[in-house]
Amino acid sequence: MDGLTSSDSIVIAVVPRDRFSMFPRCLEALYAYTDVRFRVIVVAGGADRTTKEYLHELQLQKDNMSVVLVDRLLMQGEARNIAMRQADERFCVVLENDTIVHENWLSPMLECMREEGAAAVMPLIFWYRGIHAAGCILEEREKDGAVVFHHKIMYTEIRRKQIDYPECHCILIDRHLLPGIEVFDDVEPFDVDLGLTLRKYGLSVFLEPRSVVTYSAGPPWEVRDMPLTNLRWDAASWKAHNRRFMQKWGVTYNPSAKLASYRRQQFKLGLARWYPSRITVGLSNVGASLANRLQSLVIRGPHRITWGKSRQLR
């Protein structure tokens, strides 16, 4: 892979995850700590008036920023694909707006991509419980006549390494290795689908731990966040997208662990899910803060996918 030259530019696509209110923190850090030439594409679907005004004002201040507003709420894949279609640059970072970058976050990922020939690189991701993700792996083993397929997040072996799929909070992509491939699809698990798609085309993914970002999970929420939050944490929608995942890859999937995480999130949101107001959202913020402290004691296990015996992806 050719190295990054002075004539190259990076495009950073910033998309919402589940809170519009996180745009200021994300974008302020992005402009403070990005040390290579870049431009920004912000995609926001169904945003509230305050968010639209903020993005409009910032766009006027920044000559390297463009904003794409869509009238309706967007799913994860939709927002990313809209941003990718706006990109002409070879190197594209997809950054969720609740992920905060830190000093020297981008150059190590570019160096890793150049040296390893990777199609995608993810940074080391922290959150309130410590390390959120140090790469992700897939495991296959024979059991009862079927291939049981595990996927799990890694928290140890903090070194540059090839991984099976990236956590999607922050990803650097080499678009030259993906000609004509739309890698983001609204199926669940979303990040596993991305990894399987890259593997299908023989493309590699790496972790570069010298690059560090922080995933800033809720709370706090604001009233204006609730429509997007409810869409993101809709268990029925997740089930539908999970069915599409199973059909796409010809697998069966045990959704219990993922659905449990959705139920925990809905419990934290409480009445704010149905009756968003300053009072209900404020109560959710207090309750969720306490719940997060308790949840930090829980160790998550791997999710499981079972493939038919004849269906092994290589």
Where are these regions (language model features)?
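A short, conserved alpha-helix in the catalytic core of glycosyltransferases
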Residues: 108, 164-177, 185-212
